[in-house]
Amino acid sequence: MRSTLAIDLTCLALGPLSWTPRGIDRVELAYAWHFLNHWPGECVVVIPTLWGMRYFDRSRAVRGLLALEEIWREKISPEDDASYSRMKSFILTHSAASWSAFAPRAKPTWQQARDFFRLLRGTGLAFGKSVGSLPKDAIYLNVGQLLFLRPFISWLARRPDILSVFMIHDLLPLEYPDHHVSLGIRLDRSIVRNTAELARALIVPSHAVRTSLQQSFLPPRLATLPTHVELLPVSPAFLQPAKKDPELSHAEYFIACGAIDAHKNHILLLEVWKELVARHGDRTPKLVIAGFRSVTSKPIFDFIADHPAIHKKVIISSGLSTPALRRLIMSAKALLMPSIAEGFGLPIIEALAQGVPVLASDIPAMREAGAGGNVTYLPATDATEWRSAIEAFGKNPHGQGEVSQYVPKQWSDYFLGIEAFLTELQANQLQKHQ
């Protein structure tokens, strides 16, 4: 008999704060839908409330997920997305754009409040049950990595019978402090400390992250916890039947996706585009950067503001619905991902699943994400090599790599590995209690 599975959906509960889902949100959403639909035992969701951490039943959770997908516009047509229309207009026209008009902005407080109300209306008002009353030997699964929020997980210290399994997506602020602000470093230290104290097992998205957990500056217990490595699949939203936008089929543009963080190395791309404009003028392809603003974004926006010559060729936007983002990726010449470091690299597999080639940094996590796909790996700090590779697309539409028949990993296969890991952990726990 399977134990009760309590899946923490704190990231999704906070979803109305943002325009669209982040990569981690997509992972948590996939976990939620899978286990709510397929876990053979009882499955409940854990979220923060005004009354503390509470858990709720399947039916209420499903209503909440449906409401959140509507808030995030996960099912709309790209043609109904105003952000997509603006981006397409920029790509297809030759006039100078007011790039600042596209710049990512925080969601206004009134819209956040409105969308929280929409989420509450979707689920219905309920008090739920205290996490302290979860059934004995339940499995607690947390994949959102909001583990620095100690009050949200401190209850685990009072329930040693609970099998707590955390997903660690990366520890980049600790590994690359020069590319992160002090707050991010402090939060990651809290994540490490809380994980070492409260986790009973770990899930990681790459062998690169598994290696990171073994570094000497981390608590020794992290390296001894049972750890399952399972490479992430493409979000289901990127696998639905879809067609390219015919108006973009001959457009010359590249795309970079993900949070606008210092470690993503967008500065290199801007340096490359400045050089491309100097060399090729109006024949320079356009660069679309689709992502959220972060606390380390300022140098990116300052660079663009200080170099008017690239205003016709570079645009930054956030708030694109997932269908719209996918449509933009589908017609791009290539996806660009020059990150200094990553825990995995979701945009790589999202692009490969659309048949779009990738230029990526030659780092372990990128190699894992791009295995079997048309990926050209380049030094993360060599702007000249990146410029040459981008220019090569003007001569060869497939870039420097060979055309491959990339087969995306399926979530069903992914969860076979995850469920086998949870089953083994559960069996070991029950054996210890006998």
Q: Model segments located where?
A:
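Carbohydrate transferase catalytic cores enriched for Leloir-type hexosyltransferases
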Residues: 1-434
